[in-house]
Amino acid sequence: MEEEKASAAQSLIDVVNEIAAISDYRITVKKLCYNLARRLKLLVPMFEEIRESNEPISEDTLKTLMNLKEAMCSAKDYLKFCSQGSKIYLVMEREQVTSKLMEVSVKLEQSLSQIPYEELDISDEVREQVELVLSQFRRAKGRVDVSDDELYEDLQSLCNKSSDVDAYQPVLERVAKKLHLMEIPDLAQESVALHEMVASSGGDVGENIEEMAMVLKMIKDFVQTEDDNGEEQKVGVNSRSNGQTSTAASQKIPVIPDDFRCPISLEMMRDPVIVSSGQTYERTCIEKWIEGGHSTCPKTQQALTSTTLTPNYVLRSLIAQWCEANDIEPPKPPSSLRPRKVSSFSSPAEANKIEDLMWRLAYGNPEDQRSAAGEIRLLAKRNADNRVAIAEAGAIPLLVGLLSTPDSRIQEHSVTALLNLSICENNKGAIVSAGAIPGIVQVLKKGSMEARENAAATLFSLSVIDENKVTIGALGAIPPLVVLLNEGTQRGKKDAATALFNLCIYQGNKGKAIRAGVIPTLTRLLTEPGSGMVDEALAILAILSSHPEGKAIIGSSDAVPSLVEFIRTGSPRNRENAAAVLVHLCSGDPQHLVEAQKLGLMGPLIDLAGNGTDRGKRKAAQLLERISRLAEQQKETAVSQPEEEAEPTHPESTTEAADT
């Protein structure tokens, strides 16, 4: 049963990890899906404590855990569909989508309610967290709305009309923008999603599928018309400037070589990248393909052994040379990378500079990217307005992409630029949404020392948001932070410590830090006054001592003498943190309290109770109460023991023994 319990708990953790790996959701259901995924992630600490516990569980309890797994798998399938499914379907069939979400939520609530928590060896903090999740599922009942009414009505109006694009251009434009179907790769992915729905259901997905296909065709025609109009206007302007007719100009445009076209979009590539099969694609197109759940090369159908995309600088240079030779404007960056209007807070000169930097980041050679990332790093450090402007210009996804570059200097500039941008609260969410955490963790593991320090500082900045604490911990940031705390420079240790402190506020990260070996490092830093890390070490220990594993390891590390000394001579903050650690150590374990008393705890403790910080006074009062209780117990024991020993002794025998 012990193995079955551990296996069940691990399988639940695996399901949550699969849910956490779902990177994004369709815009119409994004908030609902993120809320559902966030609640499920909060259950991980319970599963970890069940897995690591030595206490056996009954067969009935094991069944309730497996029922929860079944409910979570249903939630995972629902979230996958909301990530990869048809955007049009999610709006037009909103009642079904709502009903399915309610069904999933009810199933999760019922499964969680059936678990006999009193039989599980889990901490009070984790139990409270599970109860919070359960209450959130209960409150969420009947409050589901997956799309706005205007979008739904627009789609219905398109279904009820003819397929004449010109007649419904305002509606089509509104729908295409709201559903993010303004680019050819997005339209291709939507088409694939509709086809996969048909295939998975045996060709029968309801009466509305034909209407959805018709609406998609109307949107495609509208987008194509818009693109054609844009090209005609561009050609017309160029030809008028040369004193020629647009017809003559168009006749001069040469045929684009096939090697310059993306095999997916058939358009000239603007940001060519190589996949593991050796084929080259437009970056945005192949990213959409991979994000859609495909694991094969679109052209060769070979399995992709890696999702790494390598910039094809040679082809990019050839395309630029061909454009110049044929007097054609080089291809603009894709919309996601194209420099957007820079914030009005920046000066015109800085606005132009930022746009140029975006171009160099996206399309420059390594030397251009290195200098551009370095300049963005400095601009973002300078003031708040620049941080807003740089983010609005689209720098964040470009910088995230450069975190994986083999060039250590580009890597260092990029992670530091993200650190400076993260000072702006609104940028924190954008950085995490851009998928920055895995790249930052990789820099933290293998970057230069300065890059590692700045990666740690970036994680600290991002972890200010509670949801990010869960994400950062789940993506493996804690072990390399512990390594940096142990072997980094003075600044690196400080950055690692502040990040670890923030992350360990979340209960689920405490066990990760403890298992990564942070406590021996922290206790060593306590005994090295010259390290300048005493404040940070005590603050983290105060958090970790509330965890059962943490309490046990601290208790076995001979930390009590140091804690008593800090209560006696430390700063106000160190005194309160040392007292907080001691409170946890002495809870249910009087030997530490006895040791502390022998070391002269009482005097400093009374002083702390009268002159410490508010928290310090509370902790001192708790310790004094425990000391008082222990003294009473010792007194009762001392009184009862002589009576028990005196009973078999008689006066005669005592005298006799004395005479002898």
UniProtKB/Swiss-Prot annotation:
- The domain of life for this entry's organism is Eukaryota
Q: Does the keyword Nucleotide-binding apply?
A: no
Which pathway is recorded for this entry? Protein modification; protein ubiquitination
Swiss-Prot/TrEMBL GO biological process terms: cell surface receptor signaling pathway; defense response to bacterium; negative regulation of apoptotic process; negative regulation of immune response; protein ubiquitination; regulation of photoperiodism, flowering
Where does the protein end up? Nucleus; Cytoplasm
Q: Which GO terms describe its cellular component?
A: cytoplasm; cytosol; nucleus
Q: Name one GO molecular function term.
A: ubiquitin-protein transferase activity
Q: How does it assemble?
A: Binds to SD11, SD16, SD17, SD18, SD113, SD129 and SD25.
The catalysed reaction is: S-ubiquitinyl-[E2 ubiquitin-conjugating enzyme]-L-cysteine + [acceptor protein]-L-lysine = [E2 ubiquitin-conjugating enzyme]-L-cysteine + N(6)-ubiquitinyl-[acceptor protein]-L-lysine
Listed EC numbers: 2.3.2.27
- Report the gene name: PUB13
Q: How is it modified after translation?
A: Phosphorylated by SD1-6 and SD1-7.
Q: What ranges does the record give for the region Disordered, renumbered to this chain?
A: 227-252, 631-660
Question: So what does this one do?
Answer: Functions as an E3 ubiquitin ligase.
User: What is the protein named?
Assistant: U-box domain-containing protein 13
Where do the ARM repeat units fall? 384-423, 425-464, 466-505, 507-546, 548-587
Which PANTHER family does the entry link to? U BOX DOMAIN-CONTAINING, U-BOX DOMAIN-CONTAINING PROTEIN 13
Biased composition of type Polar residues is found at 236-250, 651-660
What keywords is this UniProt entry annotated with?
Cytoplasm, Nucleus, Phosphoprotein, Repeat, Transferase, Ubl conjugation pathway
In what residue span(s) does the U-box domain sit?
Answer: 255-329
Main localization (coarse):
nucleus
What the entry lists under Pfam families is as follows:
Arm, PUB10_N, U-box
- Name the InterPro entries on file: Adaptor_Cbl_N_dom_sf (IPR036537), ARM-like (IPR011989), ARM-type_fold (IPR016024), Armadillo (IPR000225), RING-Ubox_PUB (IPR045210), Ubox_domain (IPR003613), Znf_RING/FYVE/PHD (IPR013083)
